């Protein structure tokens, strides 16, 4: 390996991370494992090329081959999600959201998004984020009775505040979202509807979660998470907004696009069109449902009583530990999750009363329902009966699962510390 000889410190860190991914159960809902083909595209010579502008309308010469790549990514994104227009240049989901806002909103305009404390995202109007600083953000949330989105509240807030844009989508909401209802509410006050489908994009591509594309003015997303691509973003819109969106991305919010990442996105979109990916998306949801059911059997409080997606939200208050403690305990056992606030959480975001658990990465490794049943029992034991003996047994079970479902065997044979 060239890197090993040139910079062993970086090489060793990469090798250690490969070993960590291989030897832990990755259950952070926003993480996944890309294919080697996607990594190959992202590590290609396209990283050398500047290509400001759009395909065939560049501000630099020598773009004939990167134009081919970006054209492929655009056409595949449109085909995959049945969209009229696609811009594949945003470097991230946050930048995709920023570009949409800046395309049709002015500073001080009112936006109505899901409360971060109830499962929304920073870029949907959180006060600590640019979206909450530039725009007048109002928040809808979930009902305390069942933790499902309160569409009646959304309607009342829309009528009261007359937002210029309503934002759908979430980072911690396990159930199906009624996009059509959101569009109905948006239309009632003359607002745009933007849906951030970052968490659900792979499930939507696989046909196991409702698509927001037809009913939304704008749809943004990341390409990692359930879509299993590189860490990046893209925007879908109606054709009437195409020019405004493209100008808002460049020169509005970004300079040169990352052509090596766009190549990886093109590969990602092609992979997501396959029958294998549809089966994968279905398995992700089935795994999450079984995981939720088994956790409930073990006395773990699963919010909303289950899931329709790739994630399971757990309220730990009946166990008497915080999300931070749970994250650390499971990490000691070899299971990676993240602490997560639950709706109406009395604890600060640095501690939280819950954790978020996801199945995309383990499903990529080939794990199915039987493995989810085993993992649910491990999680419950570690959370409820924390001891060195419990941890030791959990580590052994995790090791057995990881060895039975190896990750990146080709790389592991090449890279070792």
UniProtKB/Swiss-Prot annotation:
(6S)-5,6,7,8-tetrahydrofolate binds at residues 116, 120-122. It comes from the Bacteria. Homodimer. The modification N6-(pyridoxal phosphate)lysine is found at residue 225. Belongs to the SHMT family. This is Serine hydroxymethyltransferase. The gene is glyA. Disulfide bonds: none annotated. It catalyses: (6R)-5,10-methylene-5,6,7,8-tetrahydrofolate + glycine + H2O = (6S)-5,6,7,8-tetrahydrofolate + L-serine. Keywords: Amino-acid biosynthesis, Cytoplasm, One-carbon metabolism, Pyridoxal phosphate, Transferase. It holds the Pfam family SHMT. Its EC number is 2.1.2.1. The lineage of its organism: Bacteria, Pseudomonadati, Aquificota, Aquificia, Aquificales. Pathway: One-carbon metabolism; tetrahydrofolate interconversion; Amino-acid biosynthesis; glycine biosynthesis; glycine from L-serine: step 1/1. HAMAP family: SHMT. The record marks 224 as: Plays an important role in substrate specificity. GO terms for biological process: glycine biosynthetic process from serine; tetrahydrofolate interconversion. Catalyzes the reversible interconversion of serine and glycine with tetrahydrofolate (THF) serving as the one-carbon carrier. This reaction serves as the major source of one-carbon groups required for the biosynthesis of purines, thymidylate, methionine, and other important biomolecules. Also exhibits THF-independent aldolase activity toward beta-hydroxyamino acids, producing glycine and aldehydes, via a retro-aldol mechanism. One of its GO terms (cellular component) is cytosol. One of its GO terms (molecular function) is pyridoxal phosphate binding. Its cofactor is pyridoxal 5'-phosphate. It is found in: Cytoplasm.
